[in-house]
Amino acid sequence: TRISHRIFATSRSEMGSNMNYKIYLDYTMDILSHLKISCHIIDSPFIWNEQYDGGLRKTIWNDAAHRSQMNDFNRFVSTYSKDNTILIIHDSFCCEYIYLKLPDSDKIFIAGPFSFEKFTNQRITELCTYNSIPARFNEFMQLYYAALPVFTDERCIESIINTLCSK
């Protein structure tokens, strides 16, 4: 699995005492949804669901490859499931995901996909080649990237998430 990540430790360890963060989490999810970033609260252990990436992987991979990749991703995320830690996950499709284990809980917040780069036709072709995506999926990939929220300034998303974690 080709995944990179950055880890941000939250600035205040009291974020989750007695679920006081719920109002801030709801507010953050509302902001992100207005930015067209899908958000989910799920129970751990983390198990990939095709809705998290808009069906991208399920569409382009056969069932065996899809299962294998999802198992690898689940193991990766479970390794970093720690309180007071935010993961910004960058996958091989140049999609970003925000992952945060909610404190005092077995629940996980995940948001994405979105990107920090604009996608040209050439860039999409490069990503398809890099990920060994058959040519028959070119139109699907063009539509997928056209619909993906793009933020050319990473500080926008990082500020939203860091503000959540400071509460």
Where are each of the predicted segments found?
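Amphipathic coiled-coil signal-relay and dimerization helices
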Residues: 47-61
